[in-house]
Structure formats: structure tokens, C-alpha cells
Curated annotation (Swiss-Prot):
<dbReference type="GO" id="GO:0005856">
    <property type="term" value="C:cytoskeleton"/>
</dbReference>
<dbReference type="GO" id="GO:0032760">
    <property type="term" value="P:positive regulation of tumor necrosis factor production"/>
</dbReference>
<dbReference type="InterPro" id="IPR019749">
    <property type="entry name" value="Band_41_domain"/>
</dbReference>
<dbReference type="Pfam" id="PF24522">
    <property type="entry name" value="KRIT1_FRMD8_FERM_C"/>
</dbReference>
<keyword id="KW-0472">Membrane</keyword>
<feature type="domain" description="FERM">
    <location>
        <begin position="28"/>
        <end position="373"/>
    </location>
</feature>
<protein>
    <recommendedName>
        <fullName>FERM domain-containing protein 8</fullName>
    </recommendedName>
</protein>
<dbReference type="InterPro" id="IPR051594">
    <property type="entry name" value="KRIT1/FRMD8"/>
</dbReference>
<dbReference type="InterPro" id="IPR019748">
    <property type="entry name" value="FERM_central"/>
</dbReference>
<dbReference type="InterPro" id="IPR000299">
    <property type="entry name" value="FERM_domain"/>
</dbReference>
<dbReference type="InterPro" id="IPR011993">
    <property type="entry name" value="PH-like_dom_sf"/>
</dbReference>
<dbReference type="GO" id="GO:0005886">
    <property type="term" value="C:plasma membrane"/>
</dbReference>
<keyword id="KW-1003">Cell membrane</keyword>
<keyword id="KW-0963">Cytoplasm</keyword>
<dbReference type="GO" id="GO:0005829">
    <property type="term" value="C:cytosol"/>
</dbReference>
<comment type="function">
    <text>Promotes the cell surface stability of RHBDF1 and RHBDF2 and prevents their degradation via the endolysosomal pathway. By acting on RHBDF proteins, involved in ADAM17-mediated ligand shedding. May negatively regulate Wnt signaling.</text>
</comment>
<dbReference type="Pfam" id="PF00373">
    <property type="entry name" value="FERM_M"/>
</dbReference>
Length: 450
């Protein structure tokens, strides 16, 4: 998706075609990308005034998707620096014309990067589509597109997974893409060339062109390809259903497994957080993070290590967005915690020029959740077993564990007394934003940050 290696002239010419930047009412060709880089080429009239809703309809017709897919997918404008989901009323052409202004406002791009960057249109999952409804989809092509997007995010590291979960997902991907397991056809040698499309590359370390090995749950050495092959063998098949129905079942199984990840279906934003002071010189710094926001909550992910730093559902947090004069935009997350056994409130500062976007999305998701059905996890069978499994994973230092020791937070207690740090000045309490089970915290008289 990064076209930085192309010249500005050729990149712009390509952009005029693929991203709807044109003027006039004559017919124009538009290229829209799917998450797997498949393209949809459309010829549309009045490109400069066409809405995302109208373009969405043309894409559904081209893909032969049912009308129900209108809620499942959305049009996005994507570049390496910014991702924007378009509302149905948005006009993609006009948003594209404003792209450089958006980059200047919501990113830290250099002037040269802003001038060179061009977005493209992508058809992908709507972040406001509930997971519960996703598992009720019966249309195979719709399920396929959702599967492709989930798999892409797993392989790309946007959805960090434990090795065991990646093995299971890799086995399901083998079944979906290679057909039912056949011991004569499917061997480690046939799986090896496909590993990059089955297993996240960041979990694989190549040596002399071959994948190294890791210890599985039994402690013995097993190659990546053999481990994926073993999970492929274990994929359950039903002789009572057709291959078409079996494919649908396996798509749902893959998606259902991804639903266990708190950041499934999220919009992702760039930010940095303070590191705790370390070492003899008590040095600190900042850590690049991805902030993932969906209908259920907010997750802060270490972009380098590919694991959660903290994940909170909306009832567990309060938030605010501040932009002090001549200072950075900050998204504040407030949540319960403890300091050496003392219950405290914790404040996490996320520095990001996209803090305004994040705050607005959090507010909208909370409002939406108050008017719609409960999150999908409440409807999944065996939910108590899932909760038990999640607890077990966290005890084993899963990528899903909260890692508070890697975060530098401001801690304080309800009477305003500081625990090493004190509450910063604010004009309003976090708790005016939403009703939670937290008690309002009284500010200290002379708050300062250390």
C-alpha cells in the first residue's frame, strides 16, 4: 500500500484513477481495493459528486453481495499515515482533495511526506458492525471477505496472537484454501512455501531460507510447517453437509476465534506513551503504540513487541482529550489499579495528533452501545469457557495480558492524595463523560506532574 518508491508524477497519475480525484461529470474509471489487494474497477458518472453510499452500492453489485452487506462493509481512504472510514454521505472526491490538510492536522508527517502521500479507496469491514451479527451471516462471499480481512490483520501483526492461536488459525486457513486434509497431498514440504500466508512473519525467524523451530506445548521441537499441518489435520469435518456449507462453517470458526481478540474490528491510530524510568540514570523515553478502538473498548498495543500494554472495556474506563497551549494533543485514559496493594486511580497519557479522532470515536461507540444490543461475546455459546480460557492465557503471560509495568501512569487515590505522582489540572472530571462504577476523584489543591 506504500507507494513511496514510485515517482511523484506516476504516483499522482495512478491516484487520479484509483482514488477518484477528478473533476467534471463525465464517466471515469475508479479502482477500489479489497484488503487482499484484489481490485474492483468501476465506471461511474459524476465522480466529483458521487457519495460513498452510491459508490458502495456499485461495489456490492460488482461483487454480487446482498443488500445486507451495506451494514457489514464500509469505504475507507487509506495511506501509510492515516486511515479514514467514510460516512455514507461523504463524497470521496472531496475528502481526497482535503487529504493533505487532514495529514497536516492529524499526523506528524513532514511537508515532503504530505506532498507525496496519496490515499486509495478500500472496501473493508465497518467498525460499527457488531460481532454478534457477523456470526449470523449466511452469504459465503461476505464471509470470505471478512475472513480475508481477519487473516490479513493477523498476518500483518495488527491482531497480535499467541503462538497457539496462530497455529489454530493457520490450520483453519489451510482447510479453507487447500481443501479437506489429505495425507498424501498435504505434507510439510507442501506447507513450507505457504507459511508466509499462514503464519505471522513476525513470529517466524528465517535462517538460510528456512524457518527455525520452536518448542510446542509438549516441550519437543517441532517445525512451523509440521505444527500448522498438525492443526490442519485436527480441523473437524462434517460428512452431513456440502462443501459450500462446510466452507461457511470454517469461515465462521476462523472469525469466532478472532472475536476472542479485544481489538478485532478496530480502527487503529498512531500514538506514543511514556516509558517508566529505568536503569542507573533513571532514564525514560517514549514507546510507539497503536491505539485500537471498537464497539467494546480501547486497547493500547506495543507496535514493536506486538502485544497488549493495556486493554479496557468502556465500563472500565473514563477518558478525555486535551490540547494545552503549545503542547501536544493528549488522549487521557483513567481506570482502576493498585500501587503496592493500595487501590488507586491510574491516568495514562497517550500523545497523538489523532487524539481528537480517538476521543470522538470513543464517545460515539459508547453512545451506540447504549442504544443497541450487548456485545457479541454475550451471545456466543460457551462464553463461560471462553472467559476461563482468557484468564488462563493471562496467567501464562499471553499477548493479551495487560502489562502495567511497561506503562508510566499517574497514580492517585480518591481523596486527591498523590501516589508518587498527582493528578494534573483539568477543567472537568472524566466522569462527566459516562456513567461508570467509579467514584469521582477530588483534585489535589496544588497538582503537579513529576
Amino acid at each position: 500500500m506504500d507507494g513511496s518508491e514510485t515517482s511523484h508524477s506516476s504516483g499522482l497519475n495512478d491516484f487520479l484513477l484509483r482514488s477518484s480525484v477528478s473533476s467534471g461529470s463525465r464517466s471515469m474509471d475508479v479502482i477500489v481495493y479489497l484488503i487482499n489487494d484484489e481490485i474492483i474497477q468501476l465506471t461511474v458518472d459524476g465522480l466529483s459528486v458521487i457519495t460513498a453510499h452510491e459508490l458502495h452500492k456499485s461495489i456490492r453489485e460488482a461483487l454480487q453481495l446482498p443488500e445486507t452487506a451495506q451494514d457489514v462493509f464500509a469505504l475507507w481512504l487509506i495511506s501509510p499515515f492515516l486511515e479514514v472510514q467514510l460516512k455514507p454521505k461523504h463524497q470521496p472526491y472531496k475528502v481526497c482533495r482535503q487529504w493533505h490538510d487532514l495529514l497536516a492536522r492529524f499526523t506528524n508527517c513532514s511537508s515532503n511526506d504530505i506532498l507525496q502521500d496519496e490515499p486509495f479507496l478500500q472496501f473493508r469491514r465497518n467498525i460499527f458492525f457488531p460481532k454478534a451479527r457477523e456470526l449470523q451471516i449466511a452469504h459465503e462471499r461476505t464471509l470470505y471477505l471478512l475472513y480475508e480481512e481477519a487473516k490479513y490483520n493477523v498476518l500483518d501483526g495488527r491482531y497480535p496472537c499467541d503462538v497457539e492461536d496462530c497455529e489454530l488459525l493457520g490450520g483453519l486457513a489451510c482447510r479453507l484454501e487447500l481443501g479437506p486434509y489429505n495425507q498424501n497431498e498435504h505434507t510439510p514440504a507442501t506447507i513450507r512455501p505457504k507459511l508466509d500466508s499462514l503464519f505471522p512473519p513476525y513470529l517466524c525467524k528465517k535462517r538460510n531460507g528456512f524457518f527455525t523451530t520452536f518448542k510446542n506445548k509438549g516441550g519437543r521441537q517441532a517445525s512451523f510447517e509440521q505444527t500448522v499441518l498438525n492443526t490442519y489435520k485436527e480441523v473437524k469435518e462434517s460428512s452431513a453437509c456440502t462443501e459450500e456449507q462446510a466452507m461457511k462453517n470454517h469461515y465462521r470458526e476462523y472469525l469466532k476465534k478472532c472475536h476472542e481478540l479485544p481489538y478485532y474490528g478496530c480502527a487503529f491510530f498512531h500514538g506514543v506513551v511514556d516509558k517508566p524510568a529505568q536503569g542507573f540514570l533513571n532514564r525514560s523515553g517514549r514507546k510507539p503504540v497503536s491505539v485500537a478502538i471498537n464497539l467494546e473498548g480501547v486497547s493500547v498495543i506495543d507496535r514493536k513487541e506486538k502485544h497488549i500494554l493495556i486493554s479496557l472495556t468502556y465500563p472500565e474506563l473514563s477518558w478525555d482529550h486535551t490540547y494545552p497551549d503549545e503542547e501536544e494533543h493528549i488522549l487521557w485514559l483513567e481506570f482502576d489499579g493498585d500501587a503496592e496493594g493500595t487501590p488507586v486511580n491510574k491516568l495514562l497519557k497517550i500523545y497523538s495528533k489523532q487524539a481528537e479522532l480517538m476521543s470522538g470515536l470513543i464517545e460515539y461507540c459508547i453512545e451506540l452501545s447504549q442504544t443497541t444490543e450487548s456485545p457479541a461475546s454475550d451471545f456466543l455459546p460457551g462464553n463461560s469457557q471462553l472467559s476461563e480460557k482468557r484468564s488462563k492465557l493471562r496467567r501464562q503471560e499471553s499477548v493479551l495480558c495487560n502489562r502495567m509495568k511497561h506503562l508510566n501512569t499517574i497514580d492517585y487515590v480518591e481523596d486527591g492524595a498523590s501516589i508518587k505522582r498527582v493528578k494534573p489540572k483539568r477543567t472537568a472530571s472524566f466522569f462527566t463523560r459516562q456513567n461508570t462504577h467509579y467514584s469521582a476523584v477530588q483534585p489535589s489543591e496544588t497538582p503537579t506532574e513529576t
